[in-house]
From Swiss-Prot:
<dbReference type="InterPro" id="IPR016174">
    <property type="entry name" value="Di-haem_cyt_TM"/>
</dbReference>
<feature type="transmembrane region" description="Helical">
    <location>
        <begin position="69"/>
        <end position="90"/>
    </location>
</feature>
<keyword id="KW-0479">Metal-binding</keyword>
<feature type="transmembrane region" description="Helical">
    <location>
        <begin position="25"/>
        <end position="45"/>
    </location>
</feature>
<feature type="transmembrane region" description="Helical">
    <location>
        <begin position="170"/>
        <end position="190"/>
    </location>
</feature>
<dbReference type="InterPro" id="IPR027387">
    <property type="entry name" value="Cytb/b6-like_sf"/>
</dbReference>
<dbReference type="Pfam" id="PF00032">
    <property type="entry name" value="Cytochrom_B_C"/>
</dbReference>
<dbReference type="GO" id="GO:0046872">
    <property type="term" value="F:metal ion binding"/>
</dbReference>
<feature type="transmembrane region" description="Helical">
    <location>
        <begin position="312"/>
        <end position="332"/>
    </location>
</feature>
<feature type="transmembrane region" description="Helical">
    <location>
        <begin position="105"/>
        <end position="125"/>
    </location>
</feature>
<keyword id="KW-0830">Ubiquinone</keyword>
<keyword id="KW-0408">Iron</keyword>
<keyword id="KW-0813">Transport</keyword>
<comment type="function">
    <text>Component of the ubiquinol-cytochrome c reductase complex (complex III or cytochrome b-c1 complex) that is part of the mitochondrial respiratory chain. The b-c1 complex mediates electron transfer from ubiquinol to cytochrome c. Contributes to the generation of a proton gradient across the mitochondrial membrane that is then used for ATP synthesis.</text>
</comment>
<comment type="subunit">
    <text>The cytochrome bc1 complex contains 3 respiratory subunits (MT-CYB, CYC1 and UQCRFS1), 2 core proteins (UQCRC1 and UQCRC2) and probably 6 low-molecular weight proteins.</text>
</comment>
<keyword id="KW-1133">Transmembrane helix</keyword>
<feature type="binding site" description="axial binding residue">
    <location>
        <position position="75"/>
    </location>
    <ligand>
        <name>heme b b562</name>
    </ligand>
</feature>
Length: 371
């Protein structure tokens, strides 16, 4: 009977034999999520959501709490690692045409929006100079909403300016949203295993499947272990590599920061926002940069699912990756020439990908049919 149970467990999740390392980022994201919830819990024990005490409580965690600096830096670096894994996970989905599994893809986009909101609320909590100005600038975008904008902003602030109620609300939201993320992640995984994982060839995996354990579980374990090893190295050698020194100074409402740089996590979306001089236009660009990811499932025109055998689409895809890196880089720079021009051009390229890709895929199909 025990042998039958072992056989049942080992064959519980049949997976295509040829899925590559790019499929490992899902398990890495789950590891990041567990790490963030765990370190966040220990930080919440010592954190005080008060504008006069928040900054001091973060300093207290770093200096006085045993291993507090490890928790604080792991949480900060872990968030950046989380988003790096997410962006690679999304890029893999775009490259291999995984968006054709519509339910999984759309639940993933919802998950991304929730994660970005959580990261923003968390960025505000230390209440340093950069946190204060990021909160002021980003929440002010809500005033661009016609008719309701000012009322919504005042409601979110809990008054007519960013103050103690704002920080308390952001703390409560940052605490509750990870539980929503866990729920959405569960839905995402359930929907994925409803149809099963795709593979790099984009073919049906039913004819050649192997048990997930031990073949793929060990592969997942290797990349997850590599990430966990990278974390303490980064923690020890350069904990502020992905952060801004302005966050280490107390907030001063009278003096604006040189350039309000968002967290490394949401820098790409912030870069798109900054590239448009109009407030409403910038806000729409920020929203559309995420919502446009819902288009590929409905605009796929190629008869071949992945870009593996489509050289023109591949070229366009790698242009998108270069564009994304450029947007992220310009978002960390001051709002002055030539960064404004670079930011505007890269923003046009970013949105153009989602329009040009279906047209190029259709052209490729026509060329292949003729040859």
């Amino acid at each position: 009977m025990s042998n039958q149970h072992a056989l049942l467990i080992s064959n519980l999740l049949p997976v295509g034999s040829n899925i590559s390392t790019w499929w490992n980022f899902g398990s890495m994201l789950l590891t990041c999520l567990m790490l963030q919830v765990l370190t966040g819990f220990f930080l919440a024990i010592h954190y005080t959501a008060n504008i006069n005490l928040a900054f001091s409580s973060v300093v207290h965690i770093t200096r006085d709490v045993p291993c507090g600096w490890i928790m604080q830096n792991t949480h900060a670096i872990g968030a950046s690692l989380f988003f790096i894994c997410i962006y690679i996970h999304i890029a893999r989905g775009l490259y291999y045409g995984l968006y054709l599994n519509k339910n999984v893809w759309l639940s993933g986009v919802t998950l991304l929006m929730t994660l970005m909101a959580t990261a923003f609320f968390g960025y505000v909590l230390p209440w340093g100079q950069m946190s204060f100005w990021a909160a002021t600038v980003i929440t002010n975008l809500l005033t661009a909403i016609p008719y309701l904008g000012v009322a919504v902003t005042t409601w979110l602030w809990g008054g007519f300016s960013i103050n103690d109620p704002t920080l308390t609300r952001f703390c409560a939201l940052h605490f509750i949203l990870p539980f929503i993320i866990i729920s959405l992640s569960s839905i995402h995984i359930i929907l994925l295993h409803n149809e099963g994982s795709n593979n790099p060839l984009g073919t049906n995996s039913d004819i050649d499947k192997i048990p997930f354990h031990p073949y793929h579980s060990y592969k997942d374990f290797m990349t997850t272990t590599s990430m966990i090893i990278l974390l303490p190295i980064s923690l020890s050698v350069s904990p502020d590599l992905l952060x801004d020194p302005e966050k280490l100074t107390k907030p001063n409402p009278x003096x604006x920061x040189x350039x309000x740089x968002x967290x490394x996590x949401x820098x790409x979306x912030y870069g798109l926002l900054r590239s448009i001089p109009n407030k409403l236009g910038g806000t729409l660009a920020l929203l559309m940069s995420i919502l446009i990811l819902t288009l590929p499932p409905f605009t796929h025109t190629s008869y071949i699912r992945p870009m593996t055998f489509r050289p023109l689409s591949q070229t366009l895809f790698w242009t998108l990756i270069a564009t994304f890196v450029m947007i992220t880089w310009t978002a960390t720079k001051p709002v002055e020439p030539p960064f404004i021009t670079i930011s505007q051009l890269t923003s046009i390229f970013y949105f153009s990908f989602f329009i040009m890709n279906p047209l190029l895929s259709w052209t490729e199909h026509k060329i292949m049919m003729q040859s």
